[in-house]
């Protein structure tokens, strides 16, 4: 007989996420961590995209500009999103506290099995996929420099000295670019894994709430008092979920708008680079992996954003599926008001304009294709 208590722990999903912040020097009071945070802020978050942008202005051909534009846009928006999330860490922690409270409400074997076999597994797959995609993108970029031939920097960039003066200066500059882009990727892992991972957990908790709602009044020994208590507890769970949604709207309002712009630009320019400016196999591999990374960066967030809306819409049916017909008028009145609350459409928007869902994903892909056709016409 299995005597192990059935519990779910949403915070376990976020262990790797908080590790990213620790590696970047945040969420710690140690002096060395604060010093590391200062160094990364100056030389990576601020200076790294600036030196890439200045390098673009120094390029003389359209091909070189197109080659440098994807990573420049990616690093700029990585810093932009990282700053946005950094100022929202208190809200992110508040969301995690609400998740812990909702975890305590999942007591049945059915709820625990669903969360652990579906929600938790999918959320873990999300952050692992980002690590693989971004890691491969970084490795292919480094390989394109080390084995691609020539004496070129990792990316077109401006330095306040002659990079080609000596071998030592050149390789120090390349080392800075490799270290900088690796830390920028670490920042992007924190930026991009959080939205889809959290959306997945929210959708999972909405499904658990639907399970509890549909079971209200179905037990053979449930009294009117116990049934009413279960309804009030479910209403409180719904309130917490809506609070999480409001916090997510605040947290992702600006950062996800930057995400959509960055993805649209990068997908289109990367396609142009693959077709016209990739001059060796390493470059083709790099741009191909980079293109897949850009798609992966956007798709999970939009998919689980839509899933939240779908699961929220199912709550009304779950309430109706409960045993409400044998209850008194007071209970039915509360139930009816609760049903009306669940009819409201739930959607998280980027910039207060773009709903984070599959419609936005396909719109971004269409925008990228429009940029691509424009570039083809200007060729």
From Swiss-Prot:
The gene coding this protein: Or33b
Species name: Drosophila melanogaster (Fruit fly)
Quaternary organization: Interacts with Orco. Complexes exist early in the endomembrane system in olfactory sensory neurons (OSNs), coupling these complexes to the conserved ciliary trafficking pathway.
Record's keyword terms, sorted: Cell membrane, Membrane, Olfaction, Receptor, Sensory transduction, Transducer, Transmembrane, Transmembrane helix
GO cellular component: dendrite membrane; membrane; plasma membrane
Note, other: The atypical heteromeric and topological design of the odorant receptors appears to be an insect-specific solution for odor recognition, making the OR/Orco complex an attractive target for the development of highly selective insect repellents to disrupt olfactory-mediated host-seeking behaviors of insect disease vectors. Odor-evoked OR currents are independent of known G-protein-coupled second messenger pathways.
Cysteine pairs bridged by disulfides in the record: none
Function: Odorant receptor which mediates acceptance or avoidance behavior, depending on its substrates. The odorant receptor repertoire encodes a large collection of odor stimuli that vary widely in identity, intensity, and duration. May form a complex with Orco to form odorant-sensing units, providing sensitive and prolonged odorant signaling and calcium permeability. Involved in the behavioral responses to pentyl acetate and pyrazines.
Tissue distribution: Expressed in 15 cells in the antenna but not the maxillary palp.
Family the entry assigns: Belongs to the insect chemoreceptor superfamily. Heteromeric odorant receptor channel (TC 1.A.69) family. Or2a subfamily.
Keyword Ribosomal protein: no
Intracellular or extracellular location(s): Cell membrane
Gene Ontology biological process terms from the UniProt entry: detection of chemical stimulus involved in sensory perception of smell; sensory perception of smell; signal transduction
Record field: transmembrane: 38-58, 65-85, 130-150, 166-186, 257-277, 282-302, 356-376
Protein name listed in UniProt: Odorant receptor 33b
Membrane topology recorded in Swiss-Prot or TrEMBL: Multi-pass membrane protein
Extracellular topology ranges: 59-64, 151-165, 278-281, 377-379
GO molecular function: ionotropic olfactory receptor activity; odorant binding; olfactory receptor activity
Keyword presence, Transmembrane: yes
InterPro entries to which the protein is assigned, alphabetical: 7tm6_olfct_rcpt
Cross-referenced PANTHER family: ODORANT RECEPTOR, ODORANT RECEPTOR 19A-RELATED
Cytoplasmic side: 1-37, 86-129, 187-256, 303-355
């Amino acid at each position: 007989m299995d005597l192990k208590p059935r519990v779910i722990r949403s915070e376990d999903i976020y262990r790797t996420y908080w590790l990213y912040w620790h590696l970047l020097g945040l969420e710690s009071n140690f002096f060395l961590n604060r010093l590391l945070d200062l160094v990364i802020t100056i030389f990576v978050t601020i200076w790294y995209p600036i030196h890439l942008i200045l390098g673009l202005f120094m390029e003389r051909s359209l091909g070189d500009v197109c080659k440098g534009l994807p990573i420049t846009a990616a690093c700029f928006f990585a810093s932009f999103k990282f700053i946005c999330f950094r100022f929202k860490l208190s809200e992110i922690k508040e969301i995690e506290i609400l998740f812990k409270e909702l975890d305590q409400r999942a007591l049945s074997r059915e709820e625990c099995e669903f969360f652990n076999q579906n929600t938790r597994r999918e959320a873990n797959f999300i952050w692992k996929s980002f690590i693989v995609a971004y890691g491969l993108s970084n490795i292919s970029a480094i390989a394109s420099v080390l084995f691609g031939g020539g004496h070129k920097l990792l990316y077109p960039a401006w330095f306040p000295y002659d990079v080609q003066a000596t071998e030592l200066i050149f390789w120090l500059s390349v080392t800075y670019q490799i270290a900088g882009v690796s830390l920028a990727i670490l920042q992007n892992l924190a930026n991009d894994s959080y939205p889809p991972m959290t959306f997945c957990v929210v959708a999972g908790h909405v499904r658990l709430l639907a399970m509890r709602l549909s079971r209200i009044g179905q037990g053979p020994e449930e009294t009117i008092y116990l049934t009413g208590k279960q309804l009030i507890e479910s209403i409180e769970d719904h309130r917490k979920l809506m609070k999480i949604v409001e916090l997510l709207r605040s947290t992702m309002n600006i950062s996800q708008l930057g995400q959509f712009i960055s993805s649209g630009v990068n997908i289109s320019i990367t396609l142009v680079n693959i077709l016209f400016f990739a001059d060796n196999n390493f470059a083709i591999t790099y741009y191909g992996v980079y293109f897949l990374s850009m798609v992966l960066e956007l798709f999970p967030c939009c998919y689980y954003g839509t899933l939240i809306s779908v699961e929220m819409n199912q709550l009304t049916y779950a309430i109706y599926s409960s045993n409400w017909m044998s209850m008194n008028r007071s209970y039915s009145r509360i139930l009816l008001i609760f049903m009306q609350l669940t009819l409201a459409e739930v959607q998280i928007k980027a910039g207060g304009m773009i709903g984070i869902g599959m419609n936005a994903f396909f719109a971004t892909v269409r925008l990228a294709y429009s940029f691509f056709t424009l570039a083809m016409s200007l060729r």
